[in-house]
C-alpha cells in the first residue's frame, strides 16, 4: 500500500475535541538514509518525527518546532524539527555496542530530559522541559501536557523503520459542551476508544479506516490532508556565517590545524562544506577582524 507523507486534521462535531493524524514514509526514509541507525533507534526517531509533526499541526505560527531528548544512556541525543511549512528533519547520536535489539525508550535514554521548543519568526520563543518518563514517547508527551498548563492532549505513536505514524487528540476550550462533567466524560470516552488501537493497526491502516475503526458511532469531520516533506535547512551560506561568527583569527588557526581547509559537516543530512584559505579570506574581506557579523544563522 502506498502512502503520501501527510498530516490530517479532524474534529468531533458534538464535543470540544480535535485530532490530528500523521503519516511519514518517504521523509522518514530520507532521515534514516543519512545515518545507519540500529532498529530501536530508528523506531524512536520515527516516533519523534511523528510527534513533532503532530504538534506543529496544532499550532498557528510561522517558525520552527523542535523536540530534543538528551540522556546519559546509549542514545545521548535525539533531535527533530518540523517547520510551519511542514518540512521535517531529524538525527540521533548513539553507542551501537550498548543497544539491545528490543531496547525501548527507557533502556535507550535513561534519566532523559525532553525539551519542546517553539521558535516563531516573530514573537516570543517558548520552551518546555520535562523528564523523559513513561513507557514510551507517547506517554511522556501525554504526561507533559497533563502536568502543564496546556490543553489536555494525548498521543499515540509508532514507527517500524519504514513508516512512522501518529495520532493526537486534544481537548479544546468549552464551546459545545459547557458542563465540566460532560466534558470530562466525553474526553475519557474518546481517549479510551483510541487506547484500543493497536500498533499494527496504526501502522497498517489509512486515516479514514483508523477513524472509522475507532469512532464509527461519532460524528467526525475530516479535513484535507497537508503534505509533509524532508528538508534540511543547511547551506553553504549558513556555514560561512558560522565561520564569520568565530572571527578571523580562529578561522586562520583552524586552517593551519586542518592543513589548509576547514570542513563543516551538517549533522542532519551529512552534507559537507569545504572552505579553503581563499574562501576564508573572502569571508573577511573588508571586515578586518572585527569578529561575528550581524547575519542571523
Swiss-Prot record:
<comment type="function">
    <text>Redox regulated molecular chaperone. Protects both thermally unfolding and oxidatively damaged proteins from irreversible aggregation. Plays an important role in the bacterial defense system toward oxidative stress.</text>
</comment>
<keyword id="KW-0676">Redox-active center</keyword>
<keyword id="KW-0963">Cytoplasm</keyword>
<feature type="disulfide bond" description="Redox-active">
    <location>
        <begin position="266"/>
        <end position="269"/>
    </location>
</feature>
<keyword id="KW-0143">Chaperone</keyword>
<dbReference type="Pfam" id="PF01430">
    <property type="entry name" value="HSP33"/>
</dbReference>
<comment type="similarity">
    <text>Belongs to the HSP33 family.</text>
</comment>
<protein>
    <recommendedName>
        <fullName>33 kDa chaperonin</fullName>
    </recommendedName>
</protein>
<dbReference type="GO" id="GO:0051082">
    <property type="term" value="F:unfolded protein binding"/>
</dbReference>
<feature type="disulfide bond" description="Redox-active">
    <location>
        <begin position="232"/>
        <end position="234"/>
    </location>
</feature>
<dbReference type="InterPro" id="IPR016153">
    <property type="entry name" value="Heat_shock_Hsp33_N"/>
</dbReference>
<dbReference type="GO" id="GO:0005737">
    <property type="term" value="C:cytoplasm"/>
</dbReference>
<dbReference type="InterPro" id="IPR023212">
    <property type="entry name" value="Hsp33_helix_hairpin_bin_dom_sf"/>
</dbReference>
<dbReference type="GO" id="GO:0042026">
    <property type="term" value="P:protein refolding"/>
</dbReference>
<dbReference type="InterPro" id="IPR016154">
    <property type="entry name" value="Heat_shock_Hsp33_C"/>
</dbReference>
<dbReference type="GO" id="GO:0044183">
    <property type="term" value="F:protein folding chaperone"/>
</dbReference>
<dbReference type="InterPro" id="IPR000397">
    <property type="entry name" value="Heat_shock_Hsp33"/>
</dbReference>
<keyword id="KW-0862">Zinc</keyword>
<keyword id="KW-1015">Disulfide bond</keyword>
Amino acid at each position: 500500500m502506498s502512502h503520501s507523507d501527510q498530516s490530517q486534521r479532524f474534529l468531533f462535531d458534538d464535543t470540544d475535541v480535535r485530532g490530528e493524524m500523521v503519516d511519514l514514509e518517504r521523509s522518514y526514509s530520507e532521515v534514516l538514509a543519512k545515518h545507519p541507525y540500529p532498529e530501536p533507534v530508528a523506531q524512536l526517531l520515527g516516533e519523534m518525527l511523528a510527534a513533532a509533526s503532530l504538534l506543529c499541526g496544532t499550532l498557528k505560527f510561522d517558525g520552527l518546532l523542535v523536540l530534543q531528548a538528551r540522556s546519559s544512556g546509549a542514545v545521548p541525543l535525539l533531535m527533530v524539527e518540523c517547520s510551519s511549512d511542514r518540512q521535517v528533519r531529524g538525527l540521533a547520536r548513539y553507542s551501537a555496542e550498548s543497544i539491545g535489539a528490543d531496547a525501548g525508550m527507557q533502556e535507550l535514554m535513561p534519566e532523559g530530559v525532553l525539551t519542546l521548543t517553539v521558535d516563531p519568526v516573530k514573537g516570543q520563543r517558548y520552551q518546555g522541559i520535562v523528564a523523559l518518563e513513561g513507557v514510551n514517547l507517547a506517554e511522556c508527551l501525554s504526561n507533559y501536557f497533563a502536568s502543564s498548563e496546556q490543553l489536555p492532549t494525548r498521543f499515540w505513536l509508532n514507527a517500524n523503520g519504514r513508516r512512522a505514524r501518529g495520532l493526537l487528540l486534544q481537548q479544546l476550550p468549552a464551546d459545545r459542551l459547557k458542563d465540566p462533567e460532560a466534558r470530562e466524560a466525553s474526553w475519557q470516552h474518546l481517549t479510551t476508544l483510541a487506547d484500543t488501537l493497536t500498533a499494527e493497526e496504526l501502522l497498517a491502516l489509512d486515516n479514514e479506516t483508523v477513524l472509522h475503526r475507532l469512532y464509527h458511532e461519532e460524528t467526525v469531520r475530516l479535513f484535507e490532508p497537508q503534505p509533509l516533506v524532508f528538508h534540511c535547512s543547511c547551506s553553504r551560506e549558513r556555514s560561512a556565517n558560522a565561520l564569520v561568527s568565530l572571527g578571523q583569527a580562529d578561522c586562520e588557526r583552524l586552517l593551519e590545524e586542518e592543513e589548509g581547509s576547514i570542513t563543516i559537516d551538517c549533522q542532519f543530512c551529512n552534507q559537507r562544506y569545504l572552505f579553503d584559505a581563499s574562501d576564508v579570506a573572502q569571508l573577511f574581506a573588508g571586515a578586518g577582524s572585527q569578529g561575528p557579523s550581524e547575519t542571523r544563522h
